[in-house]
Amino acid sequence: GPHDGTSLFSQACDNLTGAGKIFVVSAGNNGTNNVHVKKSFTATDTLLKTVVNFSTSFPQKKTWLDIWGDPSQIFKIKLSLYNVITLISETRFFTLNSTSIDTFIVGNANDTCYFKMSLIPSDYNLKPHVLIDVYSKTNRNLCLTVKANAGTVHAWTGYVSNSTGIYGSFSTTGVVGATAGNTD
């Protein structure tokens, strides 16, 4: 969910515990990883770029990108592959339209990065939401670009395999104008 108490799970916990009680959840043991990135957009500052780093403790390059915006605000996303600082390949910008997309981009060595995207606004909090399932078979840097004219977007990276949390990070590695992640 959007990590702000408005997800269906958060609402269920509120309803189950009642006044004067708390519900405690462990959110993972990734406090030193920059798993979150945030951007507040304006009419003159419309792009967030960040490099997606995969966990080195997992044999495959897999992650989920969980992206949330402000209610009634629209944003678009694009994914790109970079060879250090050179753009190799990219998708078009995708807009929220209540659909799922299964696509890929090919690097310059015929290696492939696969994406499954769900671009569906949440019925529970009216926030735009994109969930991307990434499986990369390339050694190129993966860059997430978010485009908007207003509002704030938050993104988190993480993956679960056999009940174990796998955490990479967001960074600026090699991409001009990229934003590093944080531990929020």
Where on the chain are the PLM-derived regions?
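Loop-rich non-cytosolic ectodomains and luminal regions
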Residues: G1-D184
